[in-house]
Amino acid sequence: MEEVITIAQIVHRGTDILSLNNEEIEALVDEIYSTLKGSNDIKNIRLIDFLFTLKDFVNHVRAEQSKLPDLSMPMEAYIRQLLVDSDVVPIVSEKKKELRVRPSTRKEIFLINGTHLAVPAEAPIEIYGLKLRLKTFSPQCFMRMAEIGSFSPETLGYVASGANLTNFIRVFMKCVDQETWKKNGEGVVVTTKENIIQFTHQYIELYKFLRSGGHSWLINRLAEEMVHRKLDREDQGSHISNIVETEEIEPEENIKRVIFFLKELSTMYSVSPVFTSGYMPLLYDLYRAGYLEVLWNPVEQKFLQHAEQREKEQMILQQVDMKLMEVTTQARQYFKIMEEKIGRVQSDAIREILTMEGKVDDPNSILQEVIKACGKQEAELITTEYLNIKKQWELQEKNACAHLKLVKQLRSGLQYAESLKVLESIRVLYKEKNNTTNWNLCKACGFKLLCPHVDMLIQLQAAEASYDTMRTKLMKFSGINKEKENNQGLIYSYFCKICGEELAHFIQEDRTADVGVIGDLNSKLRIFIWQETMKACTFIHFGKLVDVKQFANIAVNVCLPLVYSIENIKKEEDYDPLTQLYAVIYIYAYILNLIYSSQKNKEFLTITIHGMKADSSLNAYVTFLLEKMMQQYSGIINQLSEITDQWIANNFREAFKKIIHQNGLQGLSVQDDTKVLLTEILLDPLYDYAATVARIDGSIPMYKPRTPKEAEYEFKTVIGRTPAELLSQKEFYDKIYTSKYRPDFTQLARLKDIYFQEESLRVWWGGRDEEKTSTLIYLRAYELFLKYLQNAPNFNSELAEFKTYENAYGEQKALLAQQGFYNIFDPNTGRADQRTRLFEYKRLPISTLYDERGLPHKWTIYVYKAVDSSQKPAEIEVTRKDVIKKIDDHYALADLRCSVCHVLQHEVGQLNIKKVQTALKASLEFNTFYAFYESRCPKGGLHDFQDKKCVKCGLFTYIIYDHLSQPELVHDYYNNYKDQYDKEKMSIRSIQIKKDMTTPSTETQPKPPQEPWTFDYGKIIKTAKILDISPAVIEAIGAMEGRSYADIREGQGAPPPPTSMDDPRLMAVDSAVRIFLYNYNCLRHVSTFNKPPMHVERLVKHLSYEEKEDLEKVLPNVVNEYHTTFKHLRVTDPASALLYSIEFLCISFLTLYEIKEPSWVVNIVREFALTELNTIIQSEKLLSKPGAFNFMIFGEDFVCSGEDSSMDDISAYSSPGLFGEDIIDRLDDPFSIEDVDISLDVLDNLAPQ
């Protein structure tokens, strides 16, 4: 008997084959091959094939990864696919300690590095003591061996990378045998390794060609004459020669090969179930671009048959699902009726029986148990009640009452004001008024209309009531209180006792004594503190596993009352930047207190900052937190002109004092590592998958474990070891957690998005280079982690190098983003243009869309021609549904025919375009005419239809919408009433014009002012002196665009005075004046606003309501005759109009700035005047030349280091000031606190005695 060598003898030879070098692998190959080369047994031949494939697999994993194109899906997405793959079904057998793989009935094709691999079912594979019996050996199976078996982490890393490489080669199953092609002129499907390599090269070239965007000619050739048209060598057909092979051949033969390639690719997708969930980006892109339409011929019969079969199966599944839903609903209702009519004792007994038998989710079993447990009368009672309920449901389904539309509109309203209006309409339909105990019934249909709690909820939301108020008032409807636990704690949900809808919920942290209520969604400040605390976790090092949500919840409970206790801070939904800054200060003070507390109790938990030693001084932590705060929240700080570094440091010190004295030393509860690890394992999808297989196999019971002993048995059966044995490596897991590389928060979020995202090719310009680079960063990080497990010192050095490249990549992205901002910056809108994709529009004659009667084409008739001239009939025309029945391999798709006008698709250019345009115009006129007389009658009033005809005007109902079936009737009716239609249309239009028209003015120009105006340059000088700027800057308002700020300050390069009333400078200055006056009037009449603008509210928030009312009396009216004078000068003397507007702006500023009494108004008005005028000037500076103004107004990130700004009077290195030239000559660190009295001794004395 001939010896058969098993896979176990090849793979499991006392060592891991993946750890061998190339020489050792080749020696192993020679040894096994010399034993098998004389064998005739088909099993040994397959093993030889497997051996060479395994060698290529290892070599590719080690050396070829960087050379292959990035066409593979991300590794995580590939692993996720394994969990849902149904081509092989693993069955775990505990008794025999082996994994049998039951093949499915569908066809299975798997590849490793492009080569088929079929392992006989009799050949067991032994990997690390685990015997496997496989029908087909595939990357999917190999990954399952790695995860379900006992592979080491190092081996798993190589396997994952190998599967990543082989994934994109799965599409190269079909290729063209060149020799057979030249002899027979057609392709032959082969699977030799050499052809696969050649086909791989062709595929990559085609992929690059499609991404280049120059492929529009290809579809024209394929869709028109295909292989019958001769192409010149100078034509773009030369591109395709580089795709098929290096030597130049006839273009029409190239097209034949491309057609063959596309056919084989689509056929492979149709007949192979592997590719239904595979990675086929090129085929998807070709299909989306419409290229596969040229392949709609008999070759696709298998595809159509599969599609039809899948559609039938889907319909059957839908019917089964509907039946299942119906039975499930019936079972639930039976239980509910039993509890209401008979009692819960009997229903609980039935539920317990079903749970013991594992049938609690089986609706048929529920129905049988309910009927069996009840007597005859009780069963009839339940059945009758259910039939009544079902009948009521059917009546409700058929109900067409008007209240249904109103209720739907109420529930889907986007604004509270709109919902309140709809609610008023609903209340009219209430059968009873002031009902708060039962459903409000509709007096029209008698069905349930609206629950009273919804009525009250809409009113409270429209009144902008707080969350606490809403919860208090809605609690009177609460009748059900359910409690459940999740990873955040205990959730208490309250439900309406009338309709069962959820009213409110809140979360109680069960892991600490502190209450963490994050349910108040209307409190923006509460959410702000929670979010900013979570962001701070990126630079805090806890040392042990800590619940960061608990950390944020405690921060909310500690900081929120302290922020609200500050004077002038109120509990309102809209909070200003000052309130946000106070919240940030208290958050960072809370973090400092945690660090201070951990230093006092080091045995429990050590909290520090990343990059700082745990025993660092408290002064060092204070310096870091202050710098971090000023850098992270510079946008908020820059909005507050009165805030200084000293102010922030002083308030930070006071906040730290309050937190220490009110909360004392604080600590966080450390999570139980054992509990966390076991929870993660039990919730892992792979564990659930393996447990399900074990239940099917009978290794563990079908029901969930009910005792600790059963739970431990299940865990050991699935994992292979007990929890105690698994947790014995706790120190190893701690070491991984504390030492392995973890990206920062933003980078991690970015990588996760790419990590779980399916990559897809794009045929438009741009591609996916950024995602490719980010994916490589992730894979490199994963590879470094595997190396860490082997050699930690080398890992640390490689990690430092990797992080250097990662940071450089981030800086490169930032520079590219800034460059793109300036390249596509739109000065009209003040922001970057969002239109980044390029589209190319193709001009087509209108006859390609419409025929000569103005009707759109419908290409629903397929024209097939015989491939052989001797075939009869030579041409067949069929519809799409008849293709399978009437078309065979002897016919090919030649053209399409329109079912409306019966013209062929390639003949649309021969249609008369003028006729098409005339018909479209007439069709539009007919549509407008008959829409106008759809209900109104030209004889007066409405139509009086009898027997589908108006007895007054003779209009038939069927020609209102159909203008083609009876063209004579359509034209006759149109000609009879065309004049009447024109008169009525003009009459309606004239009435509308009269409504919109106003009485024309008899004056030819604006009325002159009562007092003549003379220019006073002293007002401009006085204003410039207060603002500490050059008078020329004020004169340049409206004329700074395109000028450097140095020229503006010196008064150089100013444009000539305006000579036209439409000069844009007049509109710019007039707009500035109007904005100043509008904001001033908002300040004067602030008492009339329910919600004044934020900048106005900030100025008057300390005033009482009576004082706000008095502002209108004590503040002067500065408008006077501005509008009259400006309109007059704009028409008569545009140059004077410009000077007048600038002078009026200065006069208004001086009038407010020089107010002396009453004293409580002086500071408000002065601050308003300074802020408004500085804002106008700052806005004008934005229009000056780039680099000529202070980019610090955008924040520190916009300042480019290294740029010479010595020629500009505003340095790009300076920090923004309050007034003047925005220059503060400060060369030291702007975040320095060297002049702030915060020392270690002072902070140490802050602790409670």
Swiss-Prot record:
<comment type="similarity">
    <text>Belongs to the asfivirus M1249L family.</text>
</comment>
<keyword id="KW-0899">Viral immunoevasion</keyword>
<keyword id="KW-1092">Inhibition of host IRF3 by virus</keyword>
<dbReference type="GO" id="GO:0030430">
    <property type="term" value="C:host cell cytoplasm"/>
</dbReference>
<keyword id="KW-1090">Inhibition of host innate immune response by virus</keyword>
<keyword id="KW-0426">Late protein</keyword>
<dbReference type="GO" id="GO:0044423">
    <property type="term" value="C:virion component"/>
</dbReference>
<keyword id="KW-1035">Host cytoplasm</keyword>
<keyword id="KW-1113">Inhibition of host RLR pathway by virus</keyword>
<dbReference type="GO" id="GO:0039548">
    <property type="term" value="P:symbiont-mediated suppression of host cytoplasmic pattern recognition receptor signaling pathway via inhibition of IRF3 activity"/>
</dbReference>
<protein>
    <recommendedName>
        <fullName>Minor capsid protein M1249L</fullName>
    </recommendedName>
</protein>
<comment type="subunit">
    <text>Interacts with the minor capsid protein p17 and with the hexon capsid protein p72 capsomers; these interactions form a rigid zipper structure that stabilizes the capsomers. Interacts with host IRF3.</text>
</comment>
<comment type="function">
    <text>Together with the penton and the other minor capsid proteins (p17, p49), forms a complicated network immediately below the outer capsid shell, stabilizing the whole capsid. In addition, blocks IFN-beta transactivation mediated by the cGAS-STING pathway and regulates the transcriptional activity of IFN-beta. Mechanistically, suppresses the phosphorylation of host key adapter protein TBK1 and degrades host IRF3 in the cytoplasm.</text>
</comment>
<keyword id="KW-0945">Host-virus interaction</keyword>
<keyword id="KW-0946">Virion</keyword>
